[in-house]
Amino acid sequence: MLLEEGLDEVFARHQRLAAATRAAVQHWGLEVLCQEPRDYSPVLTAVLMPPGHDADQFRQVVLDNYNMSLGSGLSKVAGKVFRIGHLGECNELTLMAALSGVEMGLRVAGVPHRAGGVDAAMALLEQPMPGNAPRHLAVVN
């Protein structure tokens, strides 16, 4: 898949998915762990939980309710962040599913947030990638 898609296209897709993820996080009123845009990762986004909310408990709520696994915080940020991956074969639709699971989980877990992060990500992803033809999706009947 990597060589078929092309390295430049893969890197651009990862950057695009990362930007959409950060748009959702920002809309929710949450913060990403990495504060410097030059240091943003194109393959995962670590999201800080608000004070008084444990990231590992939130991850468990999402797993129990939606059968979706989020990454955990490591070392000094264990229990303080959860991670959303947007690499490999992740595409616009799989990212939207992941962000929907996170937003539903925030509501179920009682984590303070502003609804609509999925819409913020969707608005970014609806814009065509520069220089690329639109992707065609298979329709399943």
Q: Language-model segments: which ranges?
A:
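Short alpha-helical functional segments enriched in proximate histidine and acidic residues
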Residues: 1, 24, 105
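Structural signature of PLP-dependent enzymes
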Residues: 1-19
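Short amphipathic beta-strand starts and helix->beta connectors
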Residues: 26-31, 66-70
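Conserved PLP-binding catalytic core of the aspartate aminotransferase-like
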Residues: 31-65
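A common structural junction motif
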Residues: 62-70, 104-106
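PLP-dependent enzyme catalytic core of the Aspartate aminotransferase-like
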Residues: 76, 80-141
